Swiss-Prot record:
Classification via SMART domains: CYCLIN, Cyclin_C
Protein keywords: Cell cycle, Cell division, Cyclin
Protein name: Cyclin-D4-2
Gene designation: CYCD4-2
GO biological process, one term: cell division
One cellular-component annotation, GO: nucleus
Annotated function: May promote cell division.
Summary of subunit composition and partner proteins: Interacts with CDKA-1 to form a kinase complex.
Length: 298
């Protein structure tokens, strides 16, 4: 079998035309505060970068194994904390995970596939959002139940890329933070870094549960920006900058955030990250077995 070569993650993220808006640079660095057109285009593309519409319903009624998301979520959060990855990386990794799970089934009875998927999603997100990304073996921190060889992770990365149609420049709530903060606070310049940091932290916390999956990325971002800015949702006037949003939906998100910082929607006990016993995967299954199973997954 030919050696797997990792795809060029810088130039081939998705199949959009080359003259489309570069949302990757927007996502990483923020965008000009006057870029209303860019924001409108991002809102139009939200659905392309979201889980399938019935994903939340299937999680709630048991059609999808809810524990799969819990296990992957727990490790991603723990790994990001240990590796000192930021909330942008968490949000992007969870975006990939939810989109993948909404359209692609993992085999039942093979717990290792959940961990491998989590590692692949975090690895892809880190390559976009983080400056210093460790090698794949060093990425697998946090005492995971399984540790995989680099080649196995790379194969899962390729599967994720194909399932997501190479759309990794995802529009998430983080993409709108600076825009909404600037509109709410009337800044002519970038909003205060403290507000941006707090907003990103709150957005990352919303990934811990599933209730926020009901809402669009722009709705979550607007609600978070209003919340951290201390605005009263009933009194705030939704100007033209918010015209594409439904006020009642934004208000509902704000109530969820302000009630308990999203902990009521968290599905991890006491809002903590799950713990997994450490066991090297190579001790239980061969690389050939992993490769064979990954082939069947795709």
């Amino acid at each position: 079998m030919a050696e797997f070569m990792e795809p060029n993650l810088v130039s081939n993220f998705d199949d959009e035309k080359s003259n489309s808006v570069d949302t990757r640079s927007i996502f990483q660095m923020g965008f000009p505060l006057e870029s209303e057109e860019i924001v409108r285009e991002m809102i139009e593309k939200e659905r392309q970068h979201s889980p399938r519409d019935d994903y939340l319903k299937r999680l709630r009624n048991g059609d999808l194994d809810f524990n799969v998301r819990i296990q992957a979520l727990g490790w991603i959060w723990k790994a990001c904390e240990e590796l000192q990855f930021g909330p942008l990386c968490i949000c992007l990794a969870m975006n990939y995970l939810d989109r993948f799970l909404s359209v692609h089934d993992l085999p039942s009875g093979k717990a290792w596939t959940v961990q491998l998927l989590a590692v692949a999603c975090l690895s892809l997100a880190a390559k976009i959002e983080e400056t210093n990304v460790p090698e794949l073996m060093q990425l697998q921190v946090g005492a995971p139940m399984f540790v995989f060889e680099a080649k196995s992770v790379q194969r899962m990365e390729l599967l994720v890329l194909n399932v997501l149609r190479w759309r990794l420049r995802a529009v998430t709530p983080c993409s709108y933070v600076r825009y909404f903060l600037s509109k709410i606070n009337g800044y002519d310049q970038e909003p205060h870094s403290r507000l941006v940091t707090r907003s990103l932290q709150v957005i990352a916390s919303t990934t811990k549960g599933i209730d926020f999956l009901e809402f669009r990325a722009s709705e979550i971002a607007a609600a978070v920006a209003l919340s951290v800015s201390g605005e009263h949702f009933d009194k705030f006037s939704f100007s033209s900058s918010f015209s594409s949003l439904e006020k009642e939906r934004v208000k509902k998100i704000g109530e969820m955030i302000e009630r308990d910082g999203s902990s009521s929607s968290s599905q991890t006990p006491n809002n903590t990250v799950l713990q997994f016993k450490s066991r090297r995967y190579s001790h239980s299954l061969s690389t050939a077995s992993v490769s064979s199973s990954l082939t069947s997954l795709s």
